[in-house]
Each structure stands twice: as structure tokens, then as C-alpha cells.
Amino acid sequence: MDFASLGVPKHLREALAVRGIAAPTEIQAAFIPAAQAGENLIGEAPTGTGKTFAYLLPVMERIDPAVRAAQTLVLAPTHELAMQIATVARELAQAAGLPIGVQALIGGANIKRQIEALKKKPAIIVGSAPRVQELHRLGKLKLTGIKLLVLDEFDRLLGKQHLDEVRTVIRLLPADRQVLLLSATAGTAAVRMAQELFAPRLIRVEGASDTHENYYHIVPFRDKIKAVQKLTRRLPIRRGLVFVGRSFDAAHALEKLRFEGIKAVALLGQERRDQRRAALDAIRAGRAQLLISTDLAARGLDIEDVDYVIHLDLPEDVRTYRHRAGRTARAGKAGAVISLVDAKELDKLRALAARMEIELSRLPRA
């Protein structure tokens, strides 16, 4: 099956091809035709199976660029997720040559800038329910033209923390709007509430989802190695992998961390086999807390019970992120991925997260 057989227009298929997406996933193949037909739907599928595109493709089809008004509203339970969705929607529209705007409306951001952005009449609004309510109350956001409502991670949006806010937003929308609800883990209570509100049809794809958390920590580029040292003091890292890329040299990072008193070893890519074995033995036996490696040197690596993966350099693409992250949280065990980013790298990380459909959280302060 391909996207053409699903009725996805050529300009959107070409936009997907630019991103290296050639064939639909199982959830996309089941969800897209039903969404195109105007059904109210629940889509439940594991993380990383393409749920964002499962609803964004029908959204893009429904948008009329000639209409200067908000036509689709996407609600998300966290600011980070809203920003990620807005990023991937904006990229998809641009790649497809669609002259439409996408605007994120979240609390904590400058509301005056959001009001200015709304004057450009974006077609797609992605945001948090409280900020959407606030801007509507101020008369800055008109919702009368909304044809499609999306609740991403609807199990959280229809939970106790967000339900009242979401219900308030729903009452502001036209009665004939279509509703699409997505989640990786839709529990019975959330599905029951969704059925009560929207009477949707459930489309479920089985499979295992990632069990690791994905964090980011903003730190100036020059202080990244120092940040790794601080994380080893602050977090219960028993066995961590630190990945370097173009900006950092593994040997240099090793020297700096050892100078700070961290028990670290490294795979340098050019060491002898016995040196590589010694480094791996040290991390496996618990004599070292951190293993520093490049992506190339880590190929084929098998280390059990890695509890943290740290990106000193961001991965170049989705495949590399998943390859690195897959070193932790194996066999259902807990784990976390921490990306150390300076302000300039944050947008790149958010774009990666959006493509993978993972939620980023800022690493809590100590």
C-alpha cells in the first residue's frame, strides 16, 4: 500500500518524500481514509508509529488556503508537545507548497506576540486549552471557522487535570466540526469519556511503545562537558552512555570528565581490540559510570541496564536518535534520554522529536 492508494494528494505525497517517508504505517493506512470521510475517530497506536501524520495529512487536505481564518484546532496537554506539533505541521505545509499559516498558542509565551501572529490569520492553531480560551475571550481568536478539532494525547486532555478546560473550548466550536483523537495509551476511562463527548469510532494498532523518558537541558555550548559532570552528581546514573558527534572529540571529552573525577571510559574508534574490550568490561562491571562513544564506534554494542543516554552532540537524524535511545529502557526497564542543547539547537531537537512523535520534557531543576 502507498499514500496514493489512500487518496493523499500528490503535493502532500511529495512533501512526505522529501522527509524520506514512502509508505504509510499501519495506523496511517487505517486512520487516513476514515478521517478523509469525515468520521469522528480515536486512533490508538504506539509511540513512533506516525500518528501525527495520520491526522496532519487529512488536516492539510481540508484546509482551504483562500479562507483567511482558523480552520483546524489542535489541542495538546503540554507546551512542549504543542510546539512539536506546530513545528512538523509548519514543515509539512511548506514542503507541500501550501500558503497557510500555523500558529502555536501556549501559556508562558508572550501573548502580545501571539496576538500579532493571529492577525496573519493562520489556518492551523496548535495550543493549550487555557491559552486558546484566553485569546478567544479577548476577542483575538475566532473559532467560528473551525472544521476540525484534534486532541493529541486525548487520554490526558480528557483526564481530570484538563477536562473542564477542554470542554470549555469544545463549547466555543461549531457543532458540525469533525473530531480526531490520538493517543499511544488510551485507557478505558478516556475512551468512555471520548465516546460520551464525540461518539468516535476506535481504530487501534497493537504494539510496544518506548518506555524511556526524553529530556532536554539547555546549556551554553562551552559548558556541555561540565553539565555532564553535574548530571553524574545529581542523577542516579549507574551506567550511562554519552554520545559525541561532529562538535566534540571523544578523547577530549574523556580527558575533561576524568579531570572532574568522573569514572569514564571511551570508545575512540581507532583503539586496539583489547583496549575496546577493556572499556566495555569496565562499564559492564560497574567500574566506570560513563561510556563515551561516537555513533560509529557504538555499532553492534550490547550493554545491559543502561539507565541514561546523554547526547553531548545532537543526533543528525531520527534514525540516529532512535539508535542511541534504544540503548536504554530495554526489556521494559526504566531509562531516560537527555539531550544537552544550547539555545540554537533547541529547534532542531524539537523537529526531531516531532518527527518521532515523542514528547520532550525539560529536565527538572535539582
Regions found by a protein language model. Name each.
Residues 2-366:
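Conserved helicase RecA-like core
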